[in-house]
């Protein structure tokens, strides 16, 4: 784990990790920049592709859904192989793999928006897929970067490095919407967006230029991580303590969510471009969303309750502070993203 890694880094080398930390925090900047930039992309795509509010919010759904699926897949593979995949790779290698995956997503975004016409729903679907790949890479990066930041020096000052990285992440969150908005709209007012799209003065080609730059930065950062002698591999004990009951619970929650959203998306089947759902369909989507929310909260609380009576097979989910922390982060991030978009 990161504590053992930090203890293994000798104190005379700790001062050499300043450059390594500077490289690492650039990754934190990317997360904030892209995630906050989606808040500008949502209303733009809503107008450009003639979407309703739910459809436009699929941008955040695809983006943050990738975080969940990436972490879940890593947990599933580690459980099946009985090996902690990230510790086996090393945090440095994990970040490099994540950056390359995000670069692939940036390339997919360039292809997705190429020649996309207003109202082209198939192009919007490809944009969602590209964002999913970008965020899937972020999922790998975040899994590795946080413990890596702690490992880059004295364990007692690990929280200081995390605070610094978090501050840089917030900087990306601050400037992301400004830069993305300037790239997309220039000086055009929001009220003129529909007219500007109709007369062709605002197109998706600007998104191409943005993601060309972002993709190149991903690759540059990956190269810096890969070939930097100042960055340790940061590998740790790859032994994996199985948590079969926790795994089954998370898979069950995921399957239920897939079923819920299958019926949500089914409401849009056969709907003409630009057409709106009727009140009955809107009401059903609201009910299904509530069921999905209950599945997450109820599943986690139920798992913790069962783990109290028999902790075997539950792993870290036997501890209430973990489950309650998961729910707190779920609530906080949900509110933060909803307000921002």
Residue spans for each PLM region:
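Cytosolic juxtamembrane N-terminal segment immediately preceding the first transmembrane helix
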Residues: 1-31, 47, 117-123, 309-321
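Extracytoplasmic
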Residues: 19-51, 74, 176, 336-341
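Hydrophobic core of transmembrane alpha-helices in multi-pass small-molecule transporters
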Residues: 29, 118-141, 330-331
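Extracytoplasmic gate region of multi-pass secondary transporters
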Residues: 38-42, 177-185, 252-288, 315-341
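Central cavity-lining transmembrane alpha-helices of secondary-active solute carriers
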Residues: 57-84, 171
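Conserved MFS/SLC helix-loop-helix module at the cytosolic interface between two early adjacent transmembrane helices
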Residues: 71-125
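Glycine-rich segments within core transmembrane alpha-helices of 12-TM secondary carriers
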Residues: 157-189, 218
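C-terminal membrane-cytosol helix-exit motif in multi-pass small-molecule transporters
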Residues: 180-189, 212-239, 250-271, 287-308
């Amino acid at each position: 784990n990161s504590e053992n890694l930090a203890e293994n880094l000798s104190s005379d080398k700790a001062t050499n990790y300043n450059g390594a930390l500077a490289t690492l925090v650039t990754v934190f900047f990317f997360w904030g920049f892209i995630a906050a930039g989606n808040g500008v992309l949502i209303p733009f795509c809503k107008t450009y592709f003639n979407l309703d509010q739910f459809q436009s919010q699929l941008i955040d759904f695809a983006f943050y859904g990738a975080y969940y699926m990436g972490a879940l897949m890593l947990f599933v593979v580690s459980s099946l192989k009985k090996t902690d995949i990230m510790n086996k790779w090393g945090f440095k290698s994990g970040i490099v793999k994540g950056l390359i995956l995000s670069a692939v997503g940036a390339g997919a975004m360039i292809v997705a928006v190429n020649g996309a016409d207003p109202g082209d729903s198939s192009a919007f679907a490809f944009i969602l897929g590209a964002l999913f790949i970008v965020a899937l890479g972020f999922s790998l990066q975040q899994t590795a970067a946080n413990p890596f930041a702690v490992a880059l020096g004295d364990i007692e000052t690990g929280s200081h490095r995390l605070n610094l990285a978090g501050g840089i992440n917030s900087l990306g969150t601050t400037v992301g919407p400004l830069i993305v908005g300037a790239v997309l709209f220039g000086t055009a007012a929001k009220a003129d967006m529909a007219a500007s799209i109709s007369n062709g003065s605002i197109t998706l080609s600007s998104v191409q230029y943005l993601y060309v730059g972002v993709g190149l930065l991903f690759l540059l950062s990956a190269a810096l991580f890969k070939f930097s002698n100042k960055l340790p591999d940061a590998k740790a004990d790859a032994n994996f303590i199985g948590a079969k009951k926790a795994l089954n619970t998370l898979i069950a929650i995921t399957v239920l969510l897939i079923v819920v959203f299958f019926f949500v998306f089914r409401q849009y089947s056969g709907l003409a471009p630009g057409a709106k759902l009727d009140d009955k369909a809107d009401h059903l989507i609201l009910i299904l969303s509530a069921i999905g929310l209950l599945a997450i909260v109820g599943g986690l609380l139920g798992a913790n309750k069962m783990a109290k009576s028999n902790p075997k097979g539950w792993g870290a989910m036997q501890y209430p502070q973990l489950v309650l922390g998961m729910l707190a982060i779920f609530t906080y991030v949900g509110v933060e993203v909803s307000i921002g978009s």
